[in-house]
């Protein structure tokens, strides 16, 4: 099912114009029913694999991870695939790589669409299993293929990544979240076999920010939310994290005290998005902002850093 509720999220984008629907705060929930079955399938198939590769969006490494994965995978060797690294801030990606490695998780930065970095997948997977492979050799199991499970939430580019690795259209890729279904083993060169699983997402977001960040990148369909309110939250975050991107792309110079709605209106005026009576066309501006951010036209931007995760752990007393 798909829902958007206004019960718990206190919007920080500022006071919206007095227009129907725009004063609704956002608490995004996204959990199609087939994902319960998928989670069970992942748990049941873990015994058949040697290593788990988790594909995440390098722009939102916190929001694009499924917190259930840690419990599901347990002590299995892990590899995190920082996909769409071409759209993420390189310095931020280095911070994330260091963070995951400090947790004992191997890392691969890549862009599945162009194929950049994908060739390193097999070496990274084997590196994560170095000790296990040595034990296989001791037992005379030379040439035994590495068997891996590839997991990830919907719309992080998992199917595109698998297609690129396998050099063929094995898994059905689509732009809409939740398009990949079923189960299949995919044989990759160099003795690597992948078990493809549909992406999974938890039934309820633990933090409203998670839902927003997923929506910013398109992991949640725009049709289930108010796009103008969403764009206001994005433009406010960009003003805080990457103000120069707004200046370069929209000629906006964020000033202290400006709300998301102020910024969105300023951008609309700079682009000449006006309707009858000189009123700004906020809907058009909202869609343009989201489209250009998702397409990488605003430069390489990472919305989340390891320090955000550590701050969250401190807030919950789990550091």
Mark where each language-model region is:
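Glycine-rich phosphate-binding P-loop
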Residues: 148-167, 197
